[in-house]
Design a protein with these regions (language model features):
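Secondary-structure transition motif
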Residues: 1-124
Length: 124
């Protein structure tokens, strides 16, 4: 079984999302779109998140830091990577392991970096 190991991070200049592998100090990400000459981007280390290897119902990759809805629930869940696994948090409390939820009902609606206003709604 082949697992895709992928990270994302937001560039310090421009705030663009870069996908690839981070350096050991999590200050840069190598974008591996061009394997002959990968580009290296300085990123905000707080925004670096690991791909969970799980896709939502729209075939969108789910990363640590993403926010999602679960079915018809109005609440938003946050994805965190802790203790070696991806966890779903609801209103700041652990709800469950991401891989145990029915992904056909998960829809990523944003992330904690681009959509901080959604965090306020989550925690109210």
């Amino acid at each position: 079984m082949e697992q895709e190991i992928l990270f994302r991070g937001k560039t310090k200049s421009g705030g663009k999302w870069i996908y690839g592998m981070p350096t050991y100090d999590f200050q840069y990400i190598f974008n591996d779109d061009n394997l002959d000459s990968p580009d290296c981007y300085e990123v905000d280390s707080k925004t670096i998140g690991l791909f969970s290897t799980i896709y939502d119902k729209n075939k969108k990759r789910i990363f640590a830091g993403d926010l999602f809805k679960l079915g018809s629930e109005k609440d938003l869940f946050e994805v965190r990577f802790e203790h070696g696994c991806f966890l779903a948090y609801l209103k700041g409390k652990q709800f469950g392991i991401l891989g145990e939820l029915h992904t056909c009902f998960i829809e990523v609606v944003g992330n904690i970096y681009d959509n901080p206003e959604l965090l306020e709604v989550m925690n109210s």
